[in-house]
């Protein structure tokens, strides 16, 4: 029963794989919950700093920070591409990088060059393969994104925009919608949206809040605009990490379920093979007994 022994070996191998994927599914589920908590915890800060920034902008209409000024003429844009460091998360990276590719083709057709910042090994590898200009990178962020690890790489593009050397800065990441659904996004980071700031200013005005700024509103807004842009980037990275763990959990669950189905099929084949071998042996015994008799 050499065939039966081989099938038993395959069953054992698939069972071991199933144990691994099940463990990875459980780990991803735990990390997903923590990533969602971090993502939600970052939102109030981003909302509050946007409201204060909007209030400042309304209070100083004569001053326009470089981040809200629309640049033109450089023929260069920046792209912050957020992906994962590890794989085994379904088509998440593939989907966002496909969106990045389409955006780059659109910009190239318009004669616009791209300077990229890669956050995550998968995006960095992709950019290197296509020969894109990578001005900075941040990899091996771990399961918890720290702003101090992101500030250095992204500050390169923020400074270039403030100096008027970039026409726009885009951020590409995977937005977390729910456990089963994540959506790749390409959003304009700079110049900051006038519509979003105007809406926040209207909300502030409806509350009737006012502030006294020291040393002056312009000095405060210079600092807050940078913090606001950094908060938006951090929020995108946090959403990407929540999406990663959700996609990995779903992928590992699918792998575990597929392993279970394969084990069932292999056991059926094994039983049929064993039954055929027993039937053959019985036939040989009966034939031998008949020949002797």
From Swiss-Prot:
Entry-linked Pfam families: ATP-synt
Entry's localization field: Cell inner membrane
Predominant place of localization: membrane
Membrane topology: Peripheral membrane protein
GO CC, alphabetical: plasma membrane; proton-transporting ATP synthase complex
Keywords: ATP synthesis, Cell inner membrane, Cell membrane, CF(1), Hydrogen ion transport, Ion transport, Membrane, Transport
Single biological process term from Gene Ontology: proton motive force-driven plasma membrane ATP synthesis
Cited SUPFAM superfamilies: ATP synthase (F1-ATPase), gamma subunit
Record text on subunit structure and interactions: F-type ATPases have 2 components, CF(1) - the catalytic core - and CF(0) - the membrane proton channel. CF(1) has five subunits: alpha(3), beta(3), gamma(1), delta(1), epsilon(1). CF(0) has three main subunits: a, b and c.
Name of protein: ATP synthase gamma chain
Species this chain originates from: Leptothrix cholodnii (strain ATCC 51168 / LMG 8142 / SP-6)
């Amino acid at each position: 029963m050499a065939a039966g022994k081989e099938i038993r070996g395959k069953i054992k191998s698939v069972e071991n794989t199933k144990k691994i994927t099940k463990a990875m599914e459980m780990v991803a589920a735990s990390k997903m919950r923590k990533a969602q908590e971090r993502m939600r915890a970052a939102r109030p800060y981003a909302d509050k700093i946007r409201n204060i920034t909007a209030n400042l902008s309304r209070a100083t209409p004569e001053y326009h920070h470089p981040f809200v000024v629309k640049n033109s003429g450089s023929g260069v844009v920046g792209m912050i591409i957020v992906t994962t460091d590890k794989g085994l998360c379904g088509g998440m990276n593939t989907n966002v990088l496909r969106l990045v590719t389409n955006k780059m083709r659109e910009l190239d057709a318009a004669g616009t060059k791209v300077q990229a910042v890669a956050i995550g090994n998968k995006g960095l590898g992709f950019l290197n393969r296509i020969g894109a200009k990578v001005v900075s990178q941040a990899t091996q962020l771990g399961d918890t994104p720290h702003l101090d690890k992101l500030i250095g790489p992204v500050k390169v593009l923020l400074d270039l925009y403030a100096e008027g050397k970039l026409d726009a800065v885009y951020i590409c990441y995977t937005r977390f919608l729910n456990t089963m659904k994540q959506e790749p996004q390409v959003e304009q980071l700079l110049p900051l949206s006038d519509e979003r700031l105007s809406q926040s200013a209207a909300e502030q005005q409806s509350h009737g809040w006012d502030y006294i700024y020291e040393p002056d509103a312009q000095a405060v807004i210079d600092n807050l605009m940078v913090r606001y842009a950094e908060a938006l980037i951090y929020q995108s990275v946090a959403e990407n990490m929540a999406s990663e763990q959700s996609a990995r959990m779903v992928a590992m669950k699918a792998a575990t379920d597929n392993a279970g189905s394969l084990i069932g099929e292999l056991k059926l084949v094994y039983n049929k093979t064993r039954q055929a071998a027993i039937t053959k042996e019985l036939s040989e015994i009966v034939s031998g007994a008949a020949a002797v008799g």
